């Protein structure tokens, strides 16, 4: 189960290029042939934490997922929502994610928010980076305090102006290559969790 926003659905890249799809394919390669992986994605471009919470409530998702990923927050920042909303709703989403993951927090992987300052759209804006850091620092600290796996991929996206191959054709979102690099970091942790 992958929860999030445009960074989860893979805005402006092919249907199988998103990080959850690439993760699913990579997991399939690393497990026996008779092991199949299915993927459910609850994500939409523009979603804030509030949008995600409201949709999850309507979706009535099951609570038997072996692996859950959560990547959320960029639209709280982009839409200049009050930071206190994230402070309240990120922990709510963590609790919901754990419930979906068989009530096992070890089955949850939280992924950091990419930094869109390092894209043609973001134009190297220092204020964007500072605000993204604030969100990621909160998420990282919360995860560390609660024994939840947090994977930092933000540094990969901060190479987007020097390595244009990391940015999708829309000049804003990560490319297939960037998502591949995300998966290189997520995959070993996912394999370990699934084999426990």
Residue ranges and their predicted role:
Residues 115-196:
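Catalytic His-Asp segment of secreted/periplasmic serine-dependent ester chemistry enzymes
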Residues 98-107:
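A short helix->loop->beta-strand "cap" motif at the edges of active sites that frequently abuts
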Residues 41-44, 75-85, 123-127:
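Surface-exposed cleft-lining segments at the edges of enzyme active sites
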